[in-house]
Amino acid sequence: MRPDAVSVWKDTEVRERLSWYRQVMIGRLPAKFMLCRKIPTQVENSDASQEELWNEHASLSQQLCDLVKNVESGSESGWSLKDHHPNLLDLKGALVNRMLEHCNFCEWDCKVNRAEGKIGFCRLDRTTSVGSFFRHYGEEAPLIGVERKGGSGTIFFESCNCHCVFCQNWSISQPKTKMNIIGEAVTPVRLAEIAEELASEGAANINYVGGEPTIDLHTIVNSLTHMSTSIPLIWNSNMYCTMESMRILADLTDLWLPDFKFWRDECAKRLMWVGAKASYPEVVKRNHIFAAEHGSMIIRHLVMPGHIECCTKPILDFISETIGDKVLVNIMSQYYPSNMVPMNPEKYPDIARYPSKKEIQDAYDYARMLGLQFEQVS
């Protein structure tokens, strides 16, 4: 066990800002997806229109929000409530299945019928592929676990809705075609088995990562109906997803672990190949604000060489001005030229090097000046 995985919880700000996640991690409170089973639905999912499903979802989601508040305050016990069938979790499963038929999980909003085998911008049809899964000890200290729980139960999904030219995980995130996807094809049942296996080994959480998990939302949500272990769920995402996806996730996610890479849309378009249909920074800002109202959050910002003034400082300003009192921020210094950058340094001269010590220090100093809580997780 990493020593800081235990000592980090002595920090008052960490305990307060990650309170819900910690209570679920140590088993004092049930995970949100378990609480969804306590909320019954009267709508017959197979016969209802998608509009009717969303209307029912809005009503039940508010009930879940109230229940979470009561459980967290201690005025109600989540453990003693009985499960209902069908329930809010079943409703979410029906909704994501409908969404897959005109896919709008992410802001590319392809609207292709992936359920029938059509391929979206993500290069996926309905099949979900897992590249690997294991207990990860290199994540932020609060994710590693305490009290005999060890490692973050990371599940790496293949493919992505962004095509970052510098991606360090390009081998699984950027298959050239569907035929290049070589991971294990998983059903909801198999994905639940993977999560249960990680939990039985002592994982502190289930960490959905990639690639990008958003594009496999249908498999992930439906897998939760097959899980019996209460364990916190982490949504480790680029956050380039639609509000419909965010509403599905809000009632399931115990800890958000979002990226915020670029402030300027032109930087995102050039270096992430994203934003053609919807502005990357506008989407990500919207989703960060929404997520901060629905669970604990650690924001990741990768310091990019040459982008301190145009991106790093404005992103830190945004966090400080909107959600800085609710979140922790991991200011990451791990960037190195990868993927397409080393082969085309003349095309990407700004990021064809490591960030300098001064650039990293400038980012730290600026965050400190703004009063952001970053040192505990950076």
Please state what every model-predicted region is.
Residues 345-361:
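Active-site-adjacent loop and "lid" segments of alpha/beta metabolic enzymes
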Residues 187-349:
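Conserved AdoMet/S-adenosylmethionine-binding subsite of the radical SAM
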Residues 104-105, 162-166, 254:
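C-type cytochrome heme c attachment motif
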Residues 133-182, 193-209:
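Long, charge-rich boundary regions
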Residues 360-378:
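A cross-taxonomic marker for long C-terminal extensions/tails that follow the last structured domain
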Residues 64-157, 171-174:
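N-terminal [4Fe-4S]-dependent radical SAM core
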Residues 1-89, 95-96:
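N-terminal alpha-helical interaction blocks
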Residues 118-130, 179-193:
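Short cysteine/histidine-rich metal-coordination sites, predominantly Zn2+-binding motifs
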